[in-house]
Amino acid sequence: MEITFLGTSSGVPTRARNVSSVALRLPQRAEVWLFDCGEGTQHQLLRSDIKTSQLRRIFITHLHGDHIFGLMGLLASCGLAGNAQPVDLYGPPGLKDYIQACSKYSHTHFGNRVQVYTVEPGLVYEDEEFTVTCDLLKHRIPAFGYRIAEKDRTGRFDVEKAKSLGIPPGRIYGQLKKGETVTLTDGRVIRGQDLCGPTEAGRKFAYCTDTVFCETAIELAQGVDVLIHEATFAHQDAELAFDRLHSTSTMAAQVALAAGVNLLIMTHFSPRYAPGNPLDVTNLLQEARAIFPHTKLAYDFFNYEIPRHRSDHLVEVS
């Protein structure tokens, strides 16, 4: 699970930062999932080493232009390139109408390659490896935060140990590999987890933008490895944040602290903090770290690979 930031500016692009988009790379399944798709996202993809042919899902937080104006261009380009796999879109009410209107008036036709799903709080997507859930944040229009959770993986099955215990190969090995408990014909009870190496705990991250400080963000981010949270304003501009329902750097840090996350990565910075201005994003970083030290600043094309965690529980079986 590798995260790549394709756009980290709020509202409008700057010379150094494009508007919102984050890519989640899943190399084990040759897929890319996008979170938001602001104007110019496909150009950012071309400047990265991400393959658009692997684009499989796009999750939209809300319908403000800096989060969706890149959708149609990207989808159209995928169609022209002859991408084989479909692209599923998930987002708030109105997303499907937006896509249909753009398609109608631009005479762009996707056929069955693009499916749009309207989300509501709760489970958004699940397969054998991942679950994606969402909930409403606090913004001027309906905006959803997303939580992506990788399911735990059973550790490597110790075949030699199984043989030494006289467990016959076959279907029973498959059950033990899954961590199941089985009873042998001689009456012995064997726990699969005792024949497997350390469990690989599933990795988790949350994506919360746009929002002012809210309890929902804390709930979505509870215990995640990485929280990506907007930090549009500096603390001294908190009045603007409350007025426009955006977050300050200190609000993002407070969410991270309350949720007990491992790492906070701030993004969605106002252009007012561009280099050369009285305050820049390094000031926002200092403010956040005073509350939550494990904080990083996102920048365009910043990559972060979420590390795996293992829980040691290999037990000798007699």
From Swiss-Prot:
Zn(2+) 1 binds at residues 62, 64, 139, 210. One of its GO terms (molecular function) is 3'-tRNA processing endoribonuclease activity. Keywords: Endonuclease, Hydrolase, Metal-binding, Nuclease, tRNA processing, Zinc. CDD domains: RNaseZ_ZiPD-like_MBL-fold (cd07717). It holds the Pfam family Lactamase_B. Binds 2 Zn(2+) ions. Its cofactor is Zn(2+). Signal peptide: none annotated. Zn(2+) 2 binds at residues 66-67, 210, 268. The keyword Cytoplasm does not apply. Its EC number is 3.1.26.11. The keyword Metal-binding applies. It is an enzyme of class 3 (hydrolase). The active site is at residue 66. It catalyses: Endonucleolytic cleavage of RNA, removing extra 3' nucleotides from tRNA precursor, generating 3' termini of tRNAs. A 3'-hydroxy group is left at the tRNA terminus and a 5'-phosphoryl group is left at the trailer molecule. Zinc phosphodiesterase, which displays some tRNA 3'-processing endonuclease activity. Probably involved in tRNA maturation, by removing a 3'-trailer from precursor tRNA. NCBIfam families: PRK00055.1-3 (NF000801), RNase_Z (TIGR02651). Homodimer. Belongs to the RNase Z family. This is Ribonuclease Z. It comes from Gloeothece citriformis (strain PCC 7424) (Cyanothece sp. (strain PCC 7424)).
